[in-house]
Swiss-Prot record:
Annotated GO biological process: defense response
Homology family: Belongs to the cyclotide family. Bracelet subfamily.
Protein name: Cyclotide vibi-H
Domain comment (free text): The presence of a 'disulfide through disulfide knot' structurally defines this protein as a knottin.
Function field: Probably participates in a plant defense mechanism. Has cytotoxic activity, active against a human lymphoma cell line with an IC(50) of 1.6 uM.
Entry PTM: This is a cyclic peptide.
Cysteine-cysteine disulfides: 5-21, 9-23, 14-28
UniProt superkingdom: Eukaryota
Keywords of the record: Disulfide bond, Knottin, Plant defense
Location in chain, cross-link Cyclopeptide (Gly-Asn): 1-31
C-alpha cells in the first residue's frame, strides 16, 4: 500500500527517497 512519509514535495523533492519514499500528488509516500 501507500504509506504517507510525513513529507510534502510541492516545492522540493522528497528527501525520504533514501528510505523508499516517492512523490505522489504533492505528498511523499512509501510504496
Amino acid at each position: 500500500g501507500l504509506l504517507p512519509c510525513a513529507e510534502s514535495c510541492v516545492y522540493i523533492p522528497c528527501l525520504t527517497t533514501v528510505i523508499g519514499c516517492s512523490c505522489k500528488s504533492k505528498v511523499c509516500y512509501k510504496n
